[in-house]
Amino acid sequence: MSIPPAKRAILHVCTRETIRPLRDHVLRLKGFDVDSALTKKDALDKFWARDYDLVLIDVEGEGGIQFAEKLCSEIKSAQPEQLVAFVCNWRVANLTDCPDEIVRTEFDPAAFADGVQSIVPPPQTN
């Protein structure tokens, strides 16, 4: 009996109640273990409670940059090695320098999941 590879854990932070569960579902279908948060407080509580392979923060237009930057900075100050990515459009991507990676906002769920998977690839099996 072989032991299945560990699921990659993602903390998905998104303040949009309609989009968050859809993106969580897409990521779970791709094999990720997803915890999600609507608020900064909830995100930080979950962040401190367990280890994550990736903290994925949805940036909602230019108005969301400040929220995302503050959260990213707090996480990186506490744990510089933590991988953080923003989900955003190209314009927002040009205005930020905190995250390690950018996942472009996609209307195609498969492209979104593929973007995340390129940042946190599946574990190698022997």
How should each PLM-predicted stretch be described?
Residues 88-125:
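Output/docking surface of receiver
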Residues 38-54, 62:
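Acidic, metal-coordinating helix/loop segments flanking the phosphotransfer/catalytic sites
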Residues 17, 41, 87-93:
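Short, polar loop motifs at secondary-structure junctions
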Residues 58, 83-89:
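Short beta-strand elements of ligand-binding domains
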Residues 48-50, 74-82:
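Conserved phosphotransfer cores of two-component systems
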Residues 16-35:
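Two-component/phosphorelay signaling modules centered on CheY-like receiver
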Residues 5-9:
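Phosphate-coordination loops involved in phosphoryl transfer and adenosine-cofactor binding
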Residues 56-77:
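Conserved phosphotransfer microenvironments
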